[in-house]
UniProtKB/Swiss-Prot annotation:
Belongs to the glycosyltransferase group 1 family. Glycosyltransferase 4 subfamily. This is UDP-GlcNAc:ribostamycin N-acetylglucosaminyltransferase. One of its GO terms (molecular function) is hexosyltransferase activity. Pathway: Antibiotic biosynthesis; neomycin biosynthesis. It comes from Streptomyces fradiae. Glycosyltransferase involved in the biosynthesis of neomycin by mediating glycosylation of ribostamycin with UDP-GlcNAc as a sugar donor to generate 2'''-acetyl-6'''-hydroxyneomycin C. The keyword Cell membrane does not apply. The keyword Amino-acid biosynthesis does not apply. Residues 342-366 are annotated as: Disordered. Residues 357-366 have a biased composition (Basic and acidic residues). Its EC number is 2.4.1.285. It catalyses: ribostamycin + UDP-N-acetyl-alpha-D-glucosamine = 2'''-acetyl-6'''-hydroxyneomycin C + UDP + H(+). Keywords: Antibiotic biosynthesis, Glycosyltransferase, Transferase.
Amino acid sequence: MAEAPAGRALFEIYDEGFDSPSWGGVETALWHLSRSLREAGTEAEFYRSSEGADLDALAARVERDRVDAVFPLVESDLFEGAAWRRLPALHARTVRVWHDVSRLSADLSAPPPCPVHARVPALPGAPVAEGCPARGAHPEGPMREVFLGEWPWTRCFPRRSVIPWAADHVPAKDLCDPSGPVVLQLGKIDTVDAERCLRRLTGAGVALRVVFATWSRRGREARELVRAHQGAGRRVEVLDAYDIRTDWERVFGGASLFLLPSVFHETYNFAAAEAVQLGVPVAALGEGGNLPRFASLTAPTPDALVDRLLAGGGAVAPRPRPAAGWRDVAARYAEVIREHPAAGAGPAVPAGAGEGRGGREEEHGG
């Protein structure tokens, strides 16, 4: 007789699934998290966004299949308005993973500081406070929250855990070559800034290997910019699309640096984490959410970052590889999945718990 699973989880995935060229951070996370959960005896299944649009049907499936926890995408209709009051049984089993900050910041910049919870975090059972900028995201609802890092804005949510993602889906290698090209990701800064960045780097004779944040309009515009900068003796290689599961060496092999200018509040960034795992140093903006934890070189603006690189600042060592991997992440998620929905919320998990490794924006992740 087959042994019963340790828990049952249901994850929302974009309609494109796992075979789309637009594969990004969310797909990377769900692919490796679900595999590690299954290996540890927790059942993990998926439903597509179009299927989740019918909240009543989703609630019926959760009840019928005895799902312990359902993980919608952060932009799900489950989190719109007062929907959580209409389907309390579903929301009691809902876990919101903050893979981006779109619920709190329309332009994906850092959410504003909270004057209410700056000193004292929100407490379980307390009514949502007047003046709390997270009010519209319903921190008072029965949903559990998983954050990928510890920031001031996470203190507004009483039922929270901090569980960063991992990067050991690529091997621990030392691929850096100080004389190699700079890998440049575009699509997360304004097009005019991307053009200036390209012009300065190619004008200085820097060899580039360019990848794009393909989910964004800026990323698509950057492709056209790069084509205009190819040729005429400029050393610009373009990788329009890649699958990091198999193409990690094609992307980062022999690179001297990974240059990732992003104005977004990155809750996690797989491209940066993967570069560190592969031994390539990262350069990023200093106010990029989780990005600075992976960066060996930071600056406040794209221009200042290019200044530092051209002044020789690119000769830096990569940050240490995170110790924890997907098995560790899955173990933490399994605890969340097994938590009884009706149980009272415990204290917030400390920022360091489960760490050691250390969107749709990468989501806003890679």
